[in-house]
Amino acid sequence: GLIHKVTKVQQLCAFNQDMAGWCEKSCQAAEGKNGYCHGTKCKCGKPLSYRRK
């Protein structure tokens, strides 16, 4: 199911690295945005240098 898929995506990042490019791919598919790894999490459209204002 979808929930398992999301959980799997969480595992694709390690040490801020998009291990297989899947973070990027999933974000492009879902939102048309670049994917960035923050630690072990994949975030769409938010580079590591991103700061909330």
From Swiss-Prot:
One of its GO terms (cellular component) is extracellular region. PROSITE patterns: BSPN_CSAB. GO terms for molecular function: potassium channel regulator activity; toxin activity. InterPro entries: Long_scorpion_toxin_alpha/beta, Scorpion_toxin-like_sf. Residues 10-50 form the BetaSPN-type CS-alpha/beta domain. It comes from the Eukaryota. Its main location: secreted. Disulfide bonds join 13-37, 23-42, 27-44. Expressed by the venom gland. The keyword Signal does not apply. Keywords: Disulfide bond, Ion channel impairing toxin, Potassium channel impairing toxin, Secreted, Toxin, Voltage-gated potassium channel impairing toxin. It is found in: Secreted. The keyword Secreted applies. Inhibits voltage-gated potassium channels. Belongs to the long chain scorpion toxin family. Class 3 subfamily. This is Scorpine-like peptide. It comes from Opisthacanthus cayaporum (South American scorpion).
